[in-house]
């Protein structure tokens, strides 16, 4: 600033300070005014943007903090571009106004497609969504699916950060109407549990199909209805076999609050997150004509019109036409992944409890406990991808890792069979079809998987899955897993190719059953874990 007579130079250093933070909306071309020189009006509320900015008025300017703030803004997926401008204030030397130039992206979406699932068969799907409803970053979506065996309508609402809450508490709620064929009552190779039009249990060891001839009826046909057959032969148990696949119609909703454990600092990285919520639904077992069907029987168990009484299954709790399920759910998660989409290191832990409360005689009381732990270990084994062989001075781009996942769960209390744990499928033990390995009151799974890049958008995987029901299929109401000869435990090894797509990884896999030549192909969306 000045030089003393002795030749000493005095310098006055002023630390940059943020006087204010302003939001300015821009067009895709970067203009802040339209063709009539009017300012561009954005859809997003200013506070949705500024709440992600940790630098406040009066704070010293910090480039690292600003970079983290901009990264958080991009993480909302509401903006396609963000331009930062520092505007000096001549009357306040050293002070600047932080101007955020925001280019909004389209947040309304309409999509559709075709697919296949075991519970719905071939289905069509239409989805409507707005991820920035009223400019408040609210997400409202409607998903309608209609297939061969049923359909689903689901209306969801999400507020990722409740206004004014320093803990970043979020809210999610949904209402749904669905009709699906549950895999609990299905088997790939051993038949299915089919609907009974009517059933009367008079305590006999066997039940007899109506409308057939029997020795005790002098080889005359017994009446074709259960009521009439029961009147003529009251000491026998009777059933009227219909033979439809069992479907469940569900109407209900749920809501939950989630919160990272950040100590009230919304900008603090918090690996722990907690959830508390409530659910309610009416579940009604039906046939394909939407008639109530609370009873079913494994078709393979019927011999000459006779079946053991114990092999007739109550589809619902208390053999009721419908069940009301009311539950409270609490969960905690820990996430230290280095990459949210394709991690190569870090761990993920989750534990939850869901308590169902009986509100009438046809409403069960039970609890479901679940937990899982996943760990990734980075490796550098295969170098097929060119990013695994960088030239001198280049950074390696070779995400490969060993992933280990352990999952377990147990149900305590009187649980309806459709709430049992299923083993088998693309997100379980991959050598079996969905729910084709076990239907139990407890389960355990472990997966060991090696992931590695191949070329371009293709990656490979080699895996081994193992799972068990801990011999609990016999404890499920009606024992549907045992009636359908489901194995209960098994090991599956396999390999697959993963394709990166705009909607996420697409898995094409082949897996075997218990090291035999019995294998299945699998198509899945997203990594298994």
Task: Identify the role of each PLM range.
Residues 1, 10, 286-290:
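Interfacial loop/beta elements and low-complexity acidic/Ser/Thr-rich segments
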Residues 2-12, 98-100:
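Short glycine/threonine-rich beta-strand-turn micro-motifs
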Residues 7, 12-53, 108:
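Sec-exported N-terminal periplasmic low-complexity segments
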Residues 39-47, 59-339, 348-349, 423-426, ...:
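Gram-negative/organellar outer-membrane beta-barrel architecture
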Residues 54, 74-78, 449:
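Sec-exported extracytoplasmic/periplasmic mature domains
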Residues 108-120, 472-489:
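Small/polar, glycine/serine/threonine/aspartate-rich low-complexity segments that form flexible
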Residues 286-472, 477-479:
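C-terminal outer-membrane beta-barrel translocator/porin domains of Gram-negative envelope proteins
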Residues 475-529:
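C-terminal beta-signal and terminal closure region of outer-membrane beta-barrel proteins
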């Amino acid at each position: 600033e000045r030089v003393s007579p002795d030749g000493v130079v005095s310098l006055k250093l002023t630390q940059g300070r943020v006087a204010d933070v302003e939001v300015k909306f821009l067009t895709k071309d970067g203009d802040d005014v339209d063709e009539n020189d009017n300012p561009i009006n954005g859809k997003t509320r200013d506070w949705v943007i500024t709440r992600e900015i940790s630098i406040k008025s009066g704070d010293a300017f910090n480039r690292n903090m600003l970079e983290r703030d901009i990264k958080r803004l991009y993480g909302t997926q509401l903006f396609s571009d963000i331009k930062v401008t520092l505007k000096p204030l001549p009357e306040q030397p050293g002070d600047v106004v932080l101007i955020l130039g925001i280019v909004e992206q389209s947040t309304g979406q309409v999509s559709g497609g075709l697919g296949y699932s075991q519970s719905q068969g071939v289905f069509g799907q239409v989805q409507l969504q707005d991820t920035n409803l009223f400019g408040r970053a609210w997400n409202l979506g409607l998903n309608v699916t209609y297939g061969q065996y049923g359909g689903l309508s689901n209306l969801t609402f999400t507020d990722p950060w409740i206004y004014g809450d320093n803990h970043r508490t979020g809210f999610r709620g949904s209402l749904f109407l669905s009709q699906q064929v549950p895999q609990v009552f299905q088997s790939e190779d051993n038949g299915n549990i089919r609907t009974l039009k009517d059933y009367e249990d008079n305590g006999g060891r066997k039940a007899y199909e109506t409308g057939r001839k029997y020795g005790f009826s002098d080889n005359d046909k017994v009446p074709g209805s259960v009521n009439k057959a029961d009147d003529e032969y009251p000491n026998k148990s009777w059933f009227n076999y219909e033979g439809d696949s069992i479907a469940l119609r569900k109407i209900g909703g749920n809501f939950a609050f989630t919160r990272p454990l950040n100590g009230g600092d919304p900008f603090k990285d918090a690996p722990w997150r907690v959830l508390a919520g409530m659910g309610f639904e009416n579940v009604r077992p039906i046939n394909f004509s939407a008639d109530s069907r609370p009873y079913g029987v494994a078709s393979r168990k019927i011999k000459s019109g006779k079946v053991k009484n114990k092999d007739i299954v109550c589809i619902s709790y208390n053999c009721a036409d419908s069940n009301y399920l009311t539950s409270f759910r609490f969960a905690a998660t820990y996430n230290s992944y280095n990459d949210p989409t394709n991690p190569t290191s870090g761990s993920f832990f989750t534990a939850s409890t869901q308590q169902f409360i009986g509100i009438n005689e046809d409403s069960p009381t039970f609890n479901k406990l679940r937990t899982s732990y996943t760990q990734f270990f980075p490796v550098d084994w295969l170098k097929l991808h060119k990013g695994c062989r960088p030239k001198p001075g280049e950074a390696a781009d070779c995400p490969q890792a060993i992933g280990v996942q352990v999952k377990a769960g147990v149900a305590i209390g009187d649980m309806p069979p459709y709430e049992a744990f299923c083993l088998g499928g693309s997100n379980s033990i991959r050598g079996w079809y969905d729910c084709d390995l076990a239907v139990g009151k407890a389960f355990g799974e472990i997966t060991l998987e090696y992931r590695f890049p191949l070329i371009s958008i293709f990656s490979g995987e080699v895996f081994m899955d193992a799972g068990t029901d801990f011999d609990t299929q016999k404890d499920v109401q009606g024992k549907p897993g045992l009636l359908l000869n489901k194995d209960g435990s098994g090991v599956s090894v396999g390999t697959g190719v993963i394709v990166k797509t705009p909607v996420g990884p697409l898995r094409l896999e082949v897996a075997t059953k218990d090291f035999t030549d019995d294998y299945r192909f699998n198509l899945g969306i997203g990594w298994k874990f």
